[in-house]
């Protein structure tokens, strides 16, 4: 496993997702609510799709806040796992205060070994 390659892939995915988030940020976007009453926007969904597509070829499974739910029983023996929060701070995004990030982490044997935090508003 080439960690430098995976790091660059994660950085590029987060930047691309961040650009899409910022495209939506300047529009009159609609805010939906998830089952737990937390907000969900088109920016969450598009960012998630961009990141999932970018990481797909790594063949490492992923767990995303905006993706399907995977039980711990199903994933506890996975050697590697991506954890994605495609728009961390959706409430702040909705408030348009700039305090939100794109987060991607790589987990190996239940321990984080790499992470990317990208702040779209400040690049």
Question: Residue locations for each model-derived region?
Answer:
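DPxDG-like acidic metal-binding loop motif
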Residues: 75-123
């Amino acid at each position: 496993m080439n960690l430098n390659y995976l790091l660059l892939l994660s950085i590029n995915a987060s930047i691309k997702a961040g650009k899409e988030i910022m495209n939506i940020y300047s529009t009159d976007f609609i805010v939906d609510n998830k089952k737990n009453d937390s907000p969900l926007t088109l920016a969450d969904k598009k960012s998630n799709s961009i990141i999932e597509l970018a990481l797909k070829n790594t063949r490492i499974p992923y767990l995303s806040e905006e993706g399907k739910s995977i039980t711990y029983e199903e994933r506890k023996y996975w050697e590697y796992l991506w954890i994605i929060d495609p728009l961390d701070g959706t409430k702040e995004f909705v408030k348009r205060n700039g305090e939100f990030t794109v987060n991607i982490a790589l987990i190996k044997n239940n321990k984080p070994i790499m992470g990317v935090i990208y702040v779209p508003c400040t690049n």
